[in-house]
Amino acid sequence: MASSNVTLSNDEVLRLVKDWNFTWSVVFLLITIVLQYGYPSRSMFVYVIKMFVLWLLWPASMALSIFCAVYPIDLASQIISGILAATSCAMWISYFVQSIRLFMRTGSWWSFNPESNCLLNVPIGGTTVVRPLVEDSTSVTAVVTDGYLKMAGMHFGACDFQRLPSEVTVAKPNVLIALKMIKRQAYGTNSGVAIYHRYKAGNYRRPPIIQDQELALLRA
């Protein structure tokens, strides 16, 4: 059987480069927007997209490494690709193990956030609001402005300053840290600042919250 070589003209190569250049310009623009504005204090929607993109990087990395190992350029590239594939697989499995442990402790889907393995649990209005905590610290500041609560750069929704919880928790895969309110300062109408400081830690689940039907209806 005779083999035929397919060659491309200069115009076809230039057209192909232009098409891919446009595609990559759009991809890099989207990545820039996600990285620039993907913070919970700016846009929760973009932040969720950022988490989804980060989550997809693991399987994409494994797929590329496995493909390079199956169809190698040479023996050296095959060995390196196999090592990279095994490393990516081990790191992905470790991520899932830690995320499942955190989910069993908190019951929140934020446990699978690839950016952080710390969750801040704040009991408000008869339920517990859970948000990822990017920075691990021994103290957390709560700011209530006109009845809206914000802690560690995360929005927690409507909250009466006078009914702030006396204790919040920070959950990790291997420990639950309790933080107690040590100082509170009111200013304005239903506004103020409260400081929570770590006072104990242990290997237990997040404490259950007793439902307050009246407060739950007010928040609905």
From Swiss-Prot:
> Which InterPro entries does the protein's record reference?
M_CoV, M_MERS-like-CoV
Intravirion face residues: 41-50, 101-220
The intrachain disulfides are none
A GO term for molecular function: structural constituent of virion
Q: Where in the cell is it found?
A: Virion membrane; Host Golgi apparatus membrane
Q: Does the keyword Membrane apply?
A: yes
Give the bilayer topology. Multi-pass membrane protein
Answer whether the UniProt record assigns the keyword Glycoprotein to this protein: yes
One GO cellular component term of this record is:
viral envelope
Q: Which CDD domains match?
A: MERS-like-CoV_M (cd21567)
In this UniProt entry, which residues form the Virion surface topological domain(s)?
Answer: 2-19, 72-79
Q: Give the function comment from the record.
A: Component of the viral envelope that plays a central role in virus morphogenesis and assembly via its interactions with other viral proteins.
Self-association state and partner proteins as the record states: Homomultimer. Interacts with envelope E protein in the budding compartment of the host cell, which is located between endoplasmic reticulum and the Golgi complex. Forms a complex with HE and S proteins. Interacts with nucleocapsid N protein. This interaction probably participates in RNA packaging into the virus.
Tell me the protein family, please.
Belongs to the betacoronaviruses M protein family.
Instruction: Report what the protein is called.
Output: Membrane protein
Instruction: Please give the organism.
Output: Bat coronavirus HKU5
